[in-house]
Design a protein with these regions (language model features):
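Membrane-spanning beta-strand positions in outer-membrane beta-barrel proteins
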Residues: 31-37, 79-81, 102, 106, ...
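Membrane-embedded beta-barrel scaffold of Gram-negative outer-membrane proteins
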Residues: 1, 106, 114, 148-187
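Outer-membrane beta-barrel strand-turn architecture
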Residues: 24-30, 72-77, 97, 105-109, ...
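Outer-membrane beta-barrel domain signature, especially the mid-to-C-terminal portions
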Residues: 51, 59-61, 98, 123-153, ...
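Membrane-embedded beta-strands of outer-membrane beta-barrel proteins
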Residues: 16-20, 67-69, 99-101, 115, ...
Length: 187
């Protein structure tokens, strides 16, 4: 046993986010009342991790500038949402567009049916938790990002049915939900 004095070090991980959002409600947008939402976001993460005994020094600055928008048409029985997000990550040379869509149908006031699609990504970067998870088991990992890494992509589909019923002062709820997620370029 005993402690491994080489395993000690210092980590700082400072993250901050700022953004703004605008919402506009239409009495009628093409065929139905709608709410438009648009906005901007900026996210920065500064990670420094020094493990002196193993000569492992990590310094990483991540900056992500984003713009997002969506329009949701809705009435009592239907809602249909189309939206997207543009992200520019400083560790990638291109902008990523992530679309999303959602459909809701209420055939009765006690039944809610939904279907949704979304696309997402994760940029190749070192995460603080990846640097230290092996330490818990008594080993140390040396992490270096490969130069040819591309973003990890995900596509998700989900469907659900939600039923509600009241018995006097009590309400019951039955939710049945299924989803599928496909990952590509996993790192």
């Amino acid at each position: 046993g005993g402690q491994d004095v080489n395993a000690y070090g210092a980590t700082t991980d400072f993250t901050w986010v700022t953004g703004s959002q605008y919402i506009y409600s239409f009495d009628k947008c093409f065929f139905m009342p709608a709410d438009f939402t648009g906005g901007l976001e900026y996210n920065q993460d500064n990670l420094t991790d020094d493990m002196w005994g193993y000569n492992r020094y990590t310094k990483q600055e991540v900056r992500i500038a984003s713009a997002f928008f969506q329009n949701e048409w809705k009435n009592k029985q239907w809602s249909f949402l189309l939206g997207g997000r543009l992200d520019k990550h400083n560790m990638m040379d291109h902008v990523i567009f992530s679309p999303r869509a959602n459909l809701r149908y209420n055939p009765t006031e006690n039944m809610n049916l939904r279907a949704s699609y979304s696309f997402g990504f994760r940029a190749p970067q070192a995460f603080d938790e990846d640097l230290h998870i092996e330490n818990v088991g008594g080993t140390v990992s040396m992490i270096e990002l490969a130069k040819d890494l591309t973003e990890e992509k995900s596509q998700s589909l989900s469907i659900s049915g939600d039923l509600y019923h009241r018995w006097g002062d009590f309400q019951g709820n039955l939710l049945i939900e299924g989803f599928y997620t496909s990952l590509s370029d996993v790192f």
